[in-house]
Amino acid sequence: MAEESVSTQFLSNIIGKPVHVKLYSGMLYSGVLESIDGFMNVALSETREHYEHPNNNLLKKYASDVFLRGTQVMYISEA
C-alpha cells in the first residue's frame, strides 16, 4: 500500500472546511473547499473575493459556487 503524500493528506483533510486560495494574479478567494482535483482545480462555496489579503476591502461575494483553474492557483491554506 502506497503512503499518501503530506500535501495529498492535507488537501483531503480540508475538504468541507474554510480555506484561502491565492492566485498568481494577486486575488485571494476565501470560502469553503467543496472539491479539488489532481490539477489543483478548486471549487469553493460561500466565497468572498479580496485583493492580496483577507483584511482588504471585499471586492465581491458569490452566492453560487466558484471554480478556480489549477494553473492559476499559487497556494491553498486553511482559514
Swiss-Prot record:
Sm domain: residues covered: 6-79
Subunit organization: Component of the heptameric LSM1-LSM7 complex, which consists of LSM1, LSM2, LSM3, LSM4, LSM5, LSM6 and LSM7. Component of the heptameric LSM2-LSM8 complex, which consists of LSM2, LSM3, LSM4, LSM5, LSM6, LSM7 and LSM8. The LSm subunits form a seven-membered ring structure with a doughnut shape.
Organism annotation: Candida glabrata (strain ATCC 2001 / BCRC 20586 / JCM 3761 / NBRC 0622 / NRRL Y-65 / CBS 138)
One of the GO BP terms on file: mRNA splicing, via spliceosome
Organism phylogeny: Eukaryota, Fungi, Dikarya, Ascomycota, Saccharomycotina
Keyword Membrane among UniProt keywords: no
Family: Belongs to the snRNP Sm proteins family. SmF/LSm6 subfamily.
Cell location: Cytoplasm; Nucleus
GO molecular function, one term: RNA binding
Domain of life assignment: Eukaryota
Annotated Pfam families: LSM
Gene3D superfamilies: 2.30.30.100
Stored PROSITE patterns: SM (PS52002)
Keywords of the record: Cytoplasm, mRNA processing, mRNA splicing, Nucleus, Ribonucleoprotein, RNA-binding, rRNA processing, Spliceosome, tRNA processing
Main location class: cytoplasm
Function, as annotated: Component of LSm protein complexes, which are involved in RNA processing and may function in a chaperone-like manner, facilitating the efficient association of RNA processing factors with their substrates. Component of the cytoplasmic LSM1-LSM7 complex, which is thought to be involved in mRNA degradation by activating the decapping step in the 5'-to-3' mRNA decay pathway. Component of the nuclear LSM2-LSM8 complex, which is involved in splicing of nuclear mRNAs.
The name this protein goes by in its record: U6 snRNA-associated Sm-like protein LSm6
